[in-house]
Amino acid sequence: MIKGTHWPNLVSKSYTDACETSKVMDFNFIFAHMYCADMSTDGKLQAGVRAAAFGLVDDKHFELYKRRIENALFRYRDQCDGNAAPPARLSDNGDCCHHFVRDAARVVESIKSVEATSVGINVIVLLPYLKQLQIALKMLSDAFACCAKTIGGLQMYVQDLLSHCLLYADRVEAAGRALQVMNLFLNSGGPLYECDLCKEASADPRFLKPKECCQYSLCYACCVALWKTASTHAKCPACSTSFKS
């Protein structure tokens, strides 16, 4: 066992947590091929990846029932599309919606089939849709007391799977933190972009505002602060050139 001032106690809780994290790192993620360098800043791309997870459920629904998930209440609505909020009511025209219970049961059966074929961490892709489905089932529960047993069973399954996904989510976040530390060793010689005003630095070249006048480096946060305090136009702190609006 290695102990000392530079190496962690291998039986410590942090080491145990690290072992759990390593289990998350060693996987073949189902959507790894959808990676793009702009993923962290491209909302449309992010929505497309999350929608691909719903596509797995929709495809399974078609395989089982020879039809897509057509009920709007159970279609995936992404937060980046501006229509993530669930419908205010089951029907806008007063039509009977009792068949929604059957539709929900079919959706849940499709999810069960997807879950059965999902290896390890891959089940986490269902998390956004499960949160949405949980709200939809609550609406059905409030509307149809006569189907309380059926709807209650669907809610129980969704809640259990949601809890399972959230457990993996915690591990993924821990893995993300570990990877950030590991990347320090891979990119130890990479450039740092430092703001000459606030002295903050980042490895992301987008941290700094493009230079328009002199060689003075300014981050976007400082640029915004200068605009807020300027009477007319913000000016470069070094050469006093007015920035473009």
From Swiss-Prot:
Any single Pfam family the record assigns to this protein: Baculo_IE-1
PROSITE patterns named among the record's database cross-references: ZF_RING_2
GO molecular function: zinc ion binding
Coiled-coil regions, chain positions: none
InterPro entries: Baculo_IE-1, Znf_RING
Keywords for this protein: Early protein, Metal-binding, Zinc, Zinc-finger
Zinc finger RING-type: from-to: 195-240
The protein's name in its UniProt record: Immediate-early protein IE-0
Native source species: Orgyia pseudotsugata multicapsid polyhedrosis virus (OpMNPV)
Gene from which the chain derives: IE-0
